[in-house]
């Protein structure tokens, strides 16, 4: 049975951070669904690209999820942080030790919910102070996994972020295979 992932998209999400994860996880055979937090599946990225998600939050049950993923970008990250049904779901997953992941500005959603207290984490450089104030142990590593939480720095680390998720859900061999297939050196 293939692993199941959901990535949550709001208007203003960072195109590459969101879609790189979707692309690479699908290449790895992981069933990842794009989820709009709006009432409609139409989303506009931070760079003005209009796209349709697979589903909306209210139409979806996440009981089969192996991981929940947040892309960064502004103002998308602010919208994700303000959407209570999502923060409630993330809190439930974190409390159960289930995998959650965020990149760029989005680790601030986790830190704002108290998830990063005393955990090693990373984020976009201008958000490092934010996550540190919320109790995280900031790292400049491209991708950091501490327990059930994975964080990454930004657009330039999106491939490493996606490969880390593949490695966690499938295997290092599968992540290496995907990296080789896209001519990417890990």
Residue ranges and their predicted role:
Residues 1-100, 109-112, 118, 130-140, ...:
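Extended, subdomain-level signal for the structured scaffold at the beginning of enzyme domains
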Residues 125-128:
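Short, acidic/turn-prone active-site loops that include or flank metal/cofactor-
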Residues 103-105:
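Short, thiol/selenol-centered motifs that function as redox-active sites or metal-ligating centers
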Residues 121:
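Anionic-ligand binding patches
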Residues 145:
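Cytochrome P450 catalytic-domain "roof"
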């Amino acid at each position: 049975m293939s692993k199941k992932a959901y990535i949550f998209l709001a208007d203003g999400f960072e195109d590459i951070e969101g879609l790189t994860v979707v692309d690479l996880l699908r290449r790895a055979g992981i069933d990842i669904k794009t989820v709009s937090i709006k009432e409609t599946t139409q989303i506009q990225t931070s760079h003005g690209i209009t796209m349709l998600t697979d589903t909306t939050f209210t139409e979806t049950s996440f009981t089969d999820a192996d991981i929940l993923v947040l892309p960064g970008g502004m103002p998308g990250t602010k919208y994700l942080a303000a959407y209570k049904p999502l923060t409630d779901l993330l809190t439930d997953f974190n409390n159960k030790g289930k995998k959650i992941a965020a990149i760029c500005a989005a680790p601030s959603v986790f830190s704002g919910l108290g998830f990063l207290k005393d955990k090693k984490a990373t984020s976009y450089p201008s958000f490092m102070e934010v996550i540190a104030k919320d109790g995280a142990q900031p790292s400049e590593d491209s991708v950091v996994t501490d327990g059930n939480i994975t964080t990454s720095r930004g657009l330039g680390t999106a491939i490493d972020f996606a490969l880390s998720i593949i490695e966690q859900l499938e295997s290092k061999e599968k992540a290496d295979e995907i990296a080789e297939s896209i001519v990417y050196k890990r």
